[in-house]
């Protein structure tokens, strides 16, 4: 007998060779129906996997992220089988599960058409109804190569050739179809219920422009139709909220052919941007930060010393000045370090908290660019804290408190991940252990739930990542706290301690917004362009009904402008309903309609965004209301 420890901590005994599915059945038939795969000692396996020794077992359902991955990866195999049935000459490339769905890449003579996509989806549903079992078969390298050579699957042959010598090579069969795959998969195609093919796109084999362009079919799948319908609704809502679309409609920013990946901010977009930067400056000043500014271009020797030349060169832009090599900065931290080195510091000076709204440039492939979300130049709201080792915990807690205040101000929930040492890194094991434990201690002191993200730290230190959740339930990684023992060592940073001797400071790198451009994109989609009053590029639109109301309207505009309220006057000879509709389209928080009665009473008829007509009030009362909204940053 073997002992199996379940997720709830309970231990059950089973015969050697009992499968994961049999364990699920022994717990309940309902769980057996819901289970998609198992997780044995951290490894995800098929339900038919035999248990041969004591192990920890977690049964994965669609409620688990790993369960969703298995479900959608299996659907990708059904997609490949359907395409091969309908287009036998199609060559198979790869078909992974991705966030909210899956895709499969095919090499075909002609691009797929929308009509063909419908036929493929129909064929997939037939395959699901056939309830074909997924069967895992392990092959030697020679057997696998021979098998796929017979099928003339050139991409599978290339993948097999590139596998390590000791790799276990497996295929998954479903009827007369099979595919190279490590798995795992659901027991049979009948376990897959509701699916939808979403789109077709071109994709280079292995992501390289040097390789052939393939046809990529994107899809999604869910165990219930209601879940699929909800997902499709969210997608349509996301299209409506797309920051690229709203950025154009609201005249916030543009991306020009002359500068792909380099955003152009228009006057209204600059208002939004400046409000965010002002908020950032005010809150940092309250917490003892000082602002610095460092150059965009620095010489090669500095980037070699920082480690960026060795670890980050592929993402950097370069130039020459007087025949010497220079690079455009991809990060702000080396500049801050150089400022620190301009004078000797005492332990009494620390912690030093320096913030910088620094413009950085990073090379991105053209295919990866996406509005403000993925650009080649952006403003990083960096701050660097130089401190004593004894101050680490308190400083990290202070940064966490700042982040919490910022995100709550925008109505954004978040979850936290602790990212540990990546494969490509610098520094000793001991330094990494101390740094990682320091971050963990601060999170636990704040009683924060967090997930460990193994191997995703920066090359110079571990980090805490803050993932924001927007109004559509999507997550965005924005805030980061990185603890760094490496840079102070590489740049020979010192402070004079209480003992009169030189010591190494510890450094924190941190960003709240991450990228101001990207954060504007996130906020635009989160609020669907209907920004809170304090952020809105235009806060008030004054709408006189006829020409005789213009003078009163102009006086009102002048009064509001004197109070730093952002106001526009629509004095066009148009019907009032037309003016109202246009102001609504521009998502302006307040519309003030001026007619005879308002002139006589010294009042305004207020229309509030999302509420409509809320009645007439005195100008003084309206000013108090909007100033309260701005002061309190009402959402």
Swiss-Prot record:
Subcellular location: Cytoplasm
A single GO cellular-component term on record: cytoplasm
EC number in record: 6.1.1.3
Pfam family of the protein (one): TGS
GO molecular function, one term: transferase activity
Domain TGS residues, every copy: 1-61
Stretches assigned to coiled coil: none
Cofactor note (record): Binds 1 zinc ion per subunit.
SUPFAM superfamilies given in the database record: Class II aaRS ABD-related, Class II aaRS and biotin synthetases, TGS-like, ThrRS/AlaRS common domain
Reaction(s) catalysed (UniProt annotation): tRNA(Thr) + L-threonine + ATP = L-threonyl-tRNA(Thr) + AMP + diphosphate + H(+)
GO biological process: threonyl-tRNA aminoacylation
HAMAP family: Thr_tRNA_synth
Function: Catalyzes the attachment of threonine to tRNA(Thr) in a two-step reaction: L-threonine is first activated by ATP to form Thr-AMP and then transferred to the acceptor end of tRNA(Thr). Also edits incorrectly charged L-seryl-tRNA(Thr).
Protein name: Threonine--tRNA ligase
Species, as recorded: Desulforamulus reducens (strain ATCC BAA-1160 / DSM 100696 / MI-1) (Desulfotomaculum reducens)
């Amino acid at each position: 007998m073997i002992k199996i420890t379940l997720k709830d901590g309970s231990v059950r005994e089973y015969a050697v060779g009992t499968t994961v599915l049999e364990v699920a059945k022994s717990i309940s038939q309902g769980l057996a129906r819901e289970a998609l795969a198992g997780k044995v000692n951290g490894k995800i396996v098929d339900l038919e996997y035999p248990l041969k020794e004591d192990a920890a077992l977690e049964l994965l359902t669609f409620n688990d992220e790993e369960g969703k991955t298995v479900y959608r990866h299996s659907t990708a195999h059904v997609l490949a089988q359907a395409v091969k049935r309908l287009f036998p000459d199609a060559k198979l490339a790869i078909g992974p599960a991705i966030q909210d769905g899956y895709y499969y890449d095919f090499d075909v003579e002609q691009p797929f058409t929308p009509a063909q996509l419908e036929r493929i989806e129909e064929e997939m549903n037939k395959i699901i109804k056939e309830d074909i079992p997924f069967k895992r078969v392990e092959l030697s390298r020679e057997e696998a190569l021979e098998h796929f050579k017979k099928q003339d699957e050139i991409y599978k042959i290339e993948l097999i050739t590139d596998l390590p010598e000791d790799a276990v090579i497996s295929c998954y069969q479903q009827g007369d179809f099979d595919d190279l795959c490590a798995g795992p998969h659901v027991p049979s195609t009948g376990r897959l219920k509701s699916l939808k093919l979403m789109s077709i796109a071109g994709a280079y084999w292995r992501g390289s422009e040097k390789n052939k362009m393939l046809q990529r079919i994107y899809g999604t799948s869910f165990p219930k139709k209601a879940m699929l319908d909800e997902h499709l609704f969210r997608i349509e809502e996301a299209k409506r909220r797309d920051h690229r679309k709203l950025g154009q409609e609201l005249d916030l920013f543009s991306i020009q052919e002359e500068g792909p990946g380099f955003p152009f901010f228009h006057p209204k977009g600059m208002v939004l941007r400046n409000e965010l930067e002002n908020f950032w400056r005010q809150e940092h000043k309250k917490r003892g930060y000082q602002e610095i500014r460092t150059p965009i271009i620095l010489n090669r020797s500095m980037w070699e010393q920082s480690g960026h030349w060795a670890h980050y060169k592929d993402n950097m832009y370069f130039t020459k000045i007087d025949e010497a090599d220079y690079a455009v900065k991809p990060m702000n931290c080396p500049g801050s370090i150089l400022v620190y080195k301009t004078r000797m510091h005492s332990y009494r000076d620390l912690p030093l908290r320096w913030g910088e709204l620094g413009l950085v440039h990073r090379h991105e492939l053209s295919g990866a660019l996406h509005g403000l979300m993925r650009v080649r130049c952006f403003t990083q709201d960096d701050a660097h804290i130089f401190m004593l080792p004894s101050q680490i915990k308190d400083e990290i807690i202070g940064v966490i408190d700042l982040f919490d205040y910022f995100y709550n101000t925008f109505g954004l929930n978040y979850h936290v991940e602790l990212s540990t040492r990546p494969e490509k890194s610098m520094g000793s094991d001991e330094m990494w252990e101390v740094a990682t434990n320091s971050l963990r201690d601060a999170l636990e002191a704040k009683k924060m739930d967090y997930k460990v993200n193994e191997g995703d730290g920066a090359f110079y230190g571990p980090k805490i990542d803050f993932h924001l959740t927007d109004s559509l339930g999507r997550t965005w990684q924005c805030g980061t706290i990185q603890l760094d023992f490496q840079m102070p060592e590489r740049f020979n940073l010192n402070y004079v301690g209480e003992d009169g001797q030189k010591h190494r400071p510890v450094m924190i790198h941190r960003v709240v917004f991450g990228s101001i451009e990207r954060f504007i994109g996130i906020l635009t989609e989160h609020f669907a362009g209907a920004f809170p009053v304090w952020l809105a590029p235009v806060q008030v639109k004054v709408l006189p009904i006829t020409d005789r109301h213009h003078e009163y309207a102009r006086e009102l505009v002048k009064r509001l402008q004197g109070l730093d309220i952002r106001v526009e006057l629509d004095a066009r000879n148009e019907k009032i309903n037309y003016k109202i509709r246009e102001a609504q389209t521009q998502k302006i928080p307040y519309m003030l309609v001026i007619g005879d009665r308002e002139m006589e009473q010294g009042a305004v008829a207020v229309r509030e965004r999302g509420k409509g007509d809320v009645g007439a009030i005195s100008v003084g009362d309206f000013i108090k209301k909007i100033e309260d909204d701005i002061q309190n940053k009402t959402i």
